[in-house]
A protein has these predicted regions:
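Bacterial N-terminal signal peptides that target proteins for export
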Residues: 1-7
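Zn-dependent metallo-beta-lactamase
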Residues: 19-75, 158-171
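Conserved beta-strand hairpin/beta-sheet module of binuclear metal-dependent hydrolase folds
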Residues: 49-96, 178-193
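Active-site neighborhood of phospho(di)ester-bond hydrolases with catalytic His/Asp-centered motifs
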Residues: 80-83, 104-112, 133-136, 191-195, ...
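Active-site metal-binding motif and surrounding structural segment of the metallo-beta-lactamase
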Residues: 88-133, 209-218, 237-240
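Cap/insert and terminal regions of metallo-dependent hydrolase folds
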Residues: 119, 189, 195-276
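Metallo-beta-lactamase
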Residues: 134-179, 185-186, 240, 270-281
Length: 281
C-alpha cells in the first residue's frame, strides 16, 4: 500500500515537472546583429497597409475603439499585425474593409496586452492553422491559448526575416516583451510599432544598429501620453536625428503628442485611423 502511495506521488511530481517545462515551441530562424543582417535593395512594388483597429476613425461607417491592428499586403506573404481589443469590433471592420482572411499567411503580435490580442477569437473563426509570431517571453498561458485556438506559435528572440523585405525586430528586453515590424525599402527602413513600451527612441536606435540602415519612416503607437512638451521636443529631435523623414502616430501616443508630431513633420506626417490605407513605395 505504501509503495502504491509513493508511486502515485512520484507520478504526480513527474506530471507537474513536465507541465512546468511547458511545450516545446518552434522559433522563427534568427539573424542576429552579430552574424550580420543581409538586406536587399528594398521592395520593388508598393506595399499597402490598412488600419483595421484604432481609437481614431478615418473612414465613415467604420468602428473606432481603443486598440490597434493593421493588415499588410503587397509582399510575397500577407500579414495581420495585432488584432485590437474587442472581437466584434475587429470582425466588423475586417469585413467592411473587404479583407480575405484566407490570404493571410501570418498573424504577428507586438505584445501580450489585450488591446492588441483581444480580437483573436474573431480572427480564428475566419482563419486557423497559420503561424502566430510572438516574442519568446510571452507567458506560457498565452502560448497554450494560441495553440488551443488553432494557431501555431512561432517564437522570436532576435531579428528574423518573415518574408522578402519584411523582418521582425526581435524581442526588446523590457518588462513588457515587445517586437516591431521592419520593412526594407529603397529609401530606408520603415518601422511599424504596436505600443512601443520599451521606448520609441530606444527601439529605433536598436533597429538602426541591428540593421545598419537609416530609418526612413515610423508609424503606430508610441506610448507617449504622459510625456511633457519638453520631453516631446527631445523625442522628436532624436527621431529626426535617426533619419526619420515620415511619421504617423496613433493609438497610445496621446492626442496632444500626436498634434506635436503633426506640427513637427508637416507634410511628411500622415494620419492613420480605422479605414485608412497607407501605401509605401
Amino acid at each position: 500500500m505504501r509503495q502504491k502511495r509513493v508511486l502515485s506521488v512520484l507520478l504526480i511530481l513527474l506530471f507537474l515537472v513536465s507541465q512546468a517545462k511547458g511545450q516545446d515551441y518552434k522559433y522563427l530562424e534568427s539573424t542576429g546583429a552579430a552574424s550580420g543582417i543581409s538586406l536587399s535593395a528594398g521592395i520593388e512594388n508598393p506595399v499597402s497597409v490598412k488600419v483595421i483597429y484604432d481609437n481614431y476613425v478615418k473612414v465613415e461607417g467604420m468602428k473606432e475603439d481603443w486598440g490597434y491592428s493593421i493588415y499588410i499586403e503587397g509582399l510575397d506573404k500577407e500579414i495581420l499585425f495585432d488584432t485590437g481589443t474587442k472581437p466584434e469590433v475587429f470582425e466588423s471592420n475586417f469585413k467592411k474593409l473587404g479583407i480575405d482572411a484566407d490570404k493571410i499567411d501570418f498573424l504577428i503580435l507586438s505584445h501580450e496586452h489585450g488591446d492588441h490580442t483581444g480580437g483573436i477569437p474573431a480572427f480564428v473563426k475566419m482563419r486557423k492553422g497559420i503561424p502566430v509570431i510572438i516574442p519568446q517571453s510571452f507567458s506560457e498561458k498565452f502560448k497554450k491559448e494560441m495553440s488551443g485556438s488553432g494557431l501555431v506559435p512561432l517564437l522570436v528572440s532576435k531579428p528574423a526575416m518573415i518574408c522578402n523585405n519584411l523582418w521582425t525586430s526581435g524581442e526588446f528586453e523590457y518588462q513588457i516583451p515587445e517586437q516591431t515590424l521592419v520593412l526594407n525599402t529603397k529609401k530606408g527602413l520603415v518601422v511599424m510599432t504596436g505600443c512601443s513600451h520599451p521606448g520609441i527612441i530606444e527601439m529605433l536606435k536598436k533597429i538602426r544598429t541591428d540593421f545598419n540602415r537609416n530609418i526612413y519612416m515610423v508609424f503606430g503607437g508610441f506610448h507617449l501620453m504622459q510625456k511633457s512638451d519638453k520631453e516631446m521636443d527631445t523625442i522628436i529631435t532624436e527621431m529626426k536625428a535617426l533619419g526619420v523623414v515620415k511619421c504617423g502616430a496613433t493609438h497610445c501616443t496621446g492626442d496632444r503628442q500626436i498634434k506635436m508630431f503633426r506640427e513637427a513633420f508637416g507634410d511628411n506626417y500622415f494620419e492613420l485611423g480605422v479605414g485608412n490605407t497607407l501605401v509605401i513605395h
